[in-house]
């Protein structure tokens, strides 16, 4: 087995950083973050094609989980190659932030929903921006996230069932309204006939 010296040194450096972050776990666990927010996240040194280094990541975990857990679920944002079916592009020149050098820059790149990962909140650095107010972007994230974790067919089947049920309910309401109108018409006709009867026959 051949071990790359450069890679080994990177893992050693990451181990030092990991020990530092581990010391912050308890206090960082109290940090409240929200779904759709973007933070710098120390992903460390990855293996193979795993995303690594300190990079922007979007919070994907629901807010209840974010409140009660020391961990959260994130997806990395990168300017590298992206697969359209499981990636969402950040709108250009829209979300500005101050980088580590104090310069104002814009968030750019693609949200890699094929690389979602659970991380300790201790890995989270500075807040960058909030994407949750962009309904169109968040809807695209949700749709592609469903596809990334293999739930597209399940959700499509559920959605088709809901759509079918809504149509059936609409038809039932229309039928009920029609029968109600017919019943009201019959009552009016009966009252009219009763009023037309001779007094002694009433």
Spans of model-derived segments:
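C-terminal terminal-subdomain/extension
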Residues: 1-10, 90-202
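Compositionally biased, charged N-terminal/linker segments
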Residues: 1-32
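A general structural signal for short secondary-structure junctions and capping/turn motifs
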Residues: 30-31, 64-65, 101-104
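Loop/turn positions that initiate beta-strands
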Residues: 35-38
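Regulatory nucleotide-sensing modules
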Residues: 40-42
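Short, charged beta-turn/beta-strand-edge "cap" motif at the junction between a beta-strand
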Residues: 44-48
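Compact nucleic-acid interaction/catalytic patches
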Residues: 49-98
């Amino acid at each position: 087995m051949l071990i790359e010296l450069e890679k080994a040194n990177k893992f050693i450096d990451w181990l030092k950083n990991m020990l530092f972050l581990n010391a912050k776990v308890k206090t960082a666990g109290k940090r409240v973050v929200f779904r759709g927010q973007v933070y710098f996240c120390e992903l460390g040194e990855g293996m193979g094609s795993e995303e690594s280094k300190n990079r922007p990541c979007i919070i994907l975990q629901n807010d209840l989980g974010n409140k009660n857990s020391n961990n959260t679920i994130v997806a990395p944002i990168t300017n590298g190659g992206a697969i359209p079916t499981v990636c969402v592009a950040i709108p250009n020149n829209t979300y500005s932030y101050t980088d580590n050098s104090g310069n104002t820059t814009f968030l750019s790149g693609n949200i890699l929903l094929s690389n979602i990962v659970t991380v300790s909140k201790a890995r989270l650095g500075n807040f960058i921006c909030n994407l949750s107010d962009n309904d169109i972007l968040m809807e695209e994230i949700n749709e592609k996230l469903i596809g990334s974790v293999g739930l597209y067919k399940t959700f499509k089947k559920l959605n088709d069932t809901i759509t079918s049920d809504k149509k059936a309910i609409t038809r039932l309401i229309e039928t009920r309204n029609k029968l109600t109108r017919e019943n009201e018409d019959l009552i009016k006709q009966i009252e009219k006939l009763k009023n037309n009867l001779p007094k002694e026959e009433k």
